[in-house]
Amino acid sequence: MTLSRYTIPILLLIILLAFGLRTYNLDKHGIFFDEKASVLVSQGMAMEGNTQKNCFYTKGKVAFTPKEFWADKSLEDYFDAIRRSDIGNSPFYYIILHNWINIFGIKDYSIRFLSVIFSCLTILLLFFFIKEHFKNVKLALLACFLMAIEPFFIAYSQQARNYSLSFFLTLLATHIFLKIVKNEENNLKKNGFYWVYGILSAMCLLSHFLSATVFLAHGLFVLLFVRKTRLWILLPFSLSIGGLAFGYWILFGGGNYTFPSLSHQAKVYYQEAHAIPNVHAGYIDPATFPNVAKKSLPIFTDLFITSNNILSNTVGKKNLILAILISILSVFSLYKYQKTRQNLWIGVVLGINGLGFLLYSTAKFQYLELVNCCLLFCFFMEYWKETTDKRQRKINWFLVILAFLPTLFLVVMTFKNGHTFGLSQRYSGFSFPYSIIIVSLALLQTNVKAKPINYIIWGVFLIQLFFVSMTIKTVLNDESFKYNYRDKARVENPYPLIANELQKMYQTGDTIVYPSYVKTFYEADIYTKNIKKSVLDAQYVNLYFPKDAEYIQTIDEREQNKVILKKRNGQKIEIFDLKGDLFRY
């Protein structure tokens, strides 16, 4: 398939846009708890110091130095750090991050930049994925643009976590999977793809355990649509590479306490969800049908950029009923227009939506977009109906499976566990590339079958993109509770600032004194649920000290917030007050 001379420049502009959005304010807001875990684990350091007993848990020893903190770690130390700080998840990501830090150091910008790279690579991969499997460059460019501005991808590309890597690897694995299916259908025996697919399955599972839902979708597709004996034989052998790697990790590596840890967490969250009173109501709730529906419906709608945030803004039963009625009438009018080509029906669409716009008591543009979503759904179904190629129809089904199965899996597990804690968009983010393709197909179908109504649909979609841009703004300003987990922006990471100030002021004979701040959420962590002394603040500061420094340091269990430099003459200088949770993100 040949590309026009404009394709590559447009693609590069999209990548540049994505890069700009993902690097904007990249280190303005300090790394939060999970990101701190990423850094510590990548260095073989368990949160709360179990792999650093020489510093924190040697009987009779009350002081330590950065040199001791940075002492060489064994392979078992790395395993223990992962099992204690991330329930054994993501070893492949930590290997990459470890080597990345060896080259670029520990700075908020550099550790997050790794995720930016994988996020931008995912956009580039999506282009080739669509070009290969849909033979449509316009579709590929539109989908890449939508991925570039998708708030979910922007938010998680700015985290030093495994998500961007996992999204890239699962899309690549899906790409290779479809190439295998295509080769088998064309009787091409290319065994190398099976090896690549198997290795990718291992990388995916060891990047995030829930990437298994993507391979579950692959298996369901084979079960429903593939009737090639050779593939049925070789694909399980290929996946056994990932299975063996995962099995080894769970049995003999840092994942050997994963399932006990998950079981412990499930019990704790269940108890909290069913407690009376429930102090975590709205965050951890019993898995009743109303609670699960309330929490899962926004996850499903936010998968599609056309309905992003729509449930947060469309409130009121009267408005919703009116929007549903207008949607039905709009779909009917569209059907009549396509049958008769009478401009009267265009007028009906414009008239009823204009009337609705006047009658909606709130969120007028969002209700217009709700109607638009219904029309776009019809156009996607029309695209499906007009797809005559059997292989392409199978891929249409595959898109739907991949778009919904990961979230459906979360819903099932939510009912199984009895609480809603794990029902989160980030755990089903593998679906986004495919939901983006679905939206792009529907939008392009309007240009084929709905002129001049397509201009109206695109116009309303552009209004939706304006609201998406507002969401992006809150993400980049660190004020999106949905994507940043907070609505009040963090300041710059205080721990490097503390380390820099201490390096300037420390003199031989001085002692650095750290606070001990014990968090109640540790109850969900099987390793630290009974902790009496926290060494986290000391760990975070020492990450930014020279590895050979010999500053004398200790921890004051009675002090919760203040980092103190105690001079050799007894003078105490307050370096920083962490103020409870205010600066401990």
Where are these regions (language model features)?
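Glycine-aromatic-enriched surface loops/turns that form tight recognition elements
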Residues: 459-462
